[in-house]
Amino acid sequence: MPIGVPKVPFRNPGEDSSNWIDVYNRLYRERLLFLGQDIDSEISNQLIGLMVYLSTESEIKDLYLFINSPGGWVIPGIAIYDTMQFVRPDVQTVCMGLAASMGSFILVGGKITKRLAFPHARVMIHQPFAAFYEAQIGEFVLEAEELLKLREILTRVYAQRTGKPLWVVSEDMERDVFMSAAEAQVHGIVDLVAVA
C-alpha cells in the first residue's frame, strides 16, 4: 500500500517546536540530493535549482548526489553535469542500485576522488540514441548530425573523467556495457567501492 513521501520532524534553528516536513526536504537541508528516476527536464531543473541554492548557502560544504537512475534525456543530463562542474562546493556522487546511460554520465561527473558506488550497484554506459520516427530526410539528417555531436561530447567527457583513451571509451559506447561496482572502479567511473 503506497504511503506517499514519508514525513519527519524538523526543528528550525531558534524554534521550540518541530514541524513535520517530507523526508527529502529534510535531507536537502543536510545537502543530500537524490536522482532516483528517469532524467527529464523537470528533475534536471529541480536538481540544478537545489545545487545552485545550496552552493549559495555554503561554498565549502560538499553536496552529495545519490543516484539510482535508468538514465533519460541527454540534454537535461548534460545540464546537471555542467551545473556540478560550475558550483563551488564539491559534488560527491554515490551510485546505489543502477546508474545507467545519463545516470552514469552524472555519476562520472562527481568530484574526482569523491565518486562512490555501493558494493552491489550496477553501472551502464552506451551511446546516445533517438527514437526512430517518420520524417523528411532532411530532418533525419539534422537529427543524426546532432546525435553525433552529443556522442562526441559524452565520449570526450568520459575519457577526460576516467583517464581512459578516447578510442577505448568510444568502443565501449558502441553497445550497452554493464559493469559491477568493482568494474566501474577499474574503468574510472567511480573512485571507491563502499564496503558493507
UniProtKB/Swiss-Prot annotation:
GO cellular component, one term: chloroplast stroma
SUPFAM superfamilies in the cross-refs: ClpP/crotonase
One GO MF term attached to the UniProt entry: ATPase binding
Keywords, sorted A to Z: Chloroplast, Hydrolase, Plastid, Protease, Serine protease
Cellular compartment(s): Plastid, Chloroplast stroma
InterPro entries per record: ClpP, ClpP/crotonase-like_dom_sf, ClpP/TepA, ClpP_His_AS, ClpP_Ser_AS
GO BP: protein quality control for misfolded or incompletely synthesized proteins
Superkingdom of the organism of origin: Eukaryota
Catalytic reaction equation(s): Hydrolysis of proteins to small peptides in the presence of ATP and magnesium. alpha-casein is the usual test substrate. In the absence of ATP, only oligopeptides shorter than five residues are hydrolyzed (such as succinyl-Leu-Tyr-|-NHMec, and Leu-Tyr-Leu-|-Tyr-Trp, in which cleavage of the -Tyr-|-Leu- and -Tyr-|-Trp bonds also occurs)
Pfam families to which the protein is assigned, alphabetical: CLP_protease (PF00574)
Annotated EC: 3.4.21.92
Residues the record marks as active site: 101, 126
Role this protein plays: Cleaves peptides in various proteins in a process that requires ATP hydrolysis. Has a chymotrypsin-like activity. Plays a major role in the degradation of misfolded proteins.
Subunit structure, as described in the record: Component of the chloroplastic Clp protease core complex.
Entry-linked HAMAP family: ClpP
Family statement: Belongs to the peptidase S14 family.
The protein's name in its UniProt record: ATP-dependent Clp protease proteolytic subunit
Species this chain originates from: Populus trichocarpa (Western balsam poplar)
